[in-house]
Amino acid sequence: LFEAGKDLDVRAGCPNLIERIEAGLLSYGNDMSIDDTPFESGLGKYCNLDTATGCLGHAALMHKQNPGRQIRPLAVAGPAVPPITWSWPLTNTAGDTAGHVSSITWSPDFEINVAIGMVHKDHWTAGTTLHVQTPDGPRAAEVRDSFWI
């Protein structure tokens, strides 16, 4: 492939940060890790537990198929946020823990901060307003039903 595209300067690449978050492309080690189940990471649609009965992890997956938290897209209000270097806490309007934001950036196309967060079940309904604790102070974060692109 690279040889065929040499005249076009074809080379290995990946989406930029903005596109990755807008599209909901998860970053292993950042948005999900070995500690997260496929169901928490939004990959449950690829786990057919009815046909995978011989799978080594079948019993564990059966036990975890209704997660208490899950990856959700979040629209965060205000001007561009500073770079994220660690997860930022999410709270509900009463100040109770609601999850965390793992990836966030300003989207010039959508004119809002686009984010990926691990949100607790009680707070993941689209339209729910949460608060993300940024280095610049708390910001309103609305849970969305889908990613932007």
Q: Which residues make up each language-model segment?
A:
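Conserved, structured C-terminal
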Residues: 1-149
